[in-house]
Amino acid sequence: LEGEQVFENNSLISEKYYDKNGKITKEYRFNKLRNGILKKYYKDTEKMSSTSTVMVNREKVDGVEKMSFIFDGETKVFREDGTLMAILQYKDGSLQDLTQKFYYPNGKIQYYIVAASDDMKDFKVKDRIITYYENGKVKQDCNQQNNGSWLCKNYDENGKFLDEEIRGAEPISNGDTKFWENILNQVLEVLAN
């Protein structure tokens, strides 16, 4: 069995796809507006790799109907061990101006950011960045100022306020363009499979 489709009143409401060993690889569930949930699974384990709210785009190419998905809403990305890696927010396929969260392997939040663009090679953040310790306590809470600098409040591992500082560069990456690329590549690799 490679796949199965479920119809209701001549309308497709769900699809499931399987690998050669019969393990589920993808499934979609639609509502009548053609929006739905896309779930993907790691190969051979049937552990969920991601779940996404999507808009479905159907078009005919050379007489064959092709279906594609546009991320629109929340996407959760999981590591192979089942722990949450990231929660991404999309609007019409774009991350721009929306909050994004990245998690430690222990399940605690690591970064809370607002995406400034969709460019993954030169990813930038804006407005607010919060970094956390592995215990879940806030490490640094930064707000972007009108002049582009960042006002950051620093805390110790117990949550006690330490100091406040003004940073010229974006506080997490300190201008290192590869920093966000490395984090995002892990997430994008899971979503691509």
Regions found by a protein language model. Name each.
Residues 1-193:
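Glycine/tyrosine- and acidic-biased, solvent-exposed loop/turn segments at the edges of beta-strands
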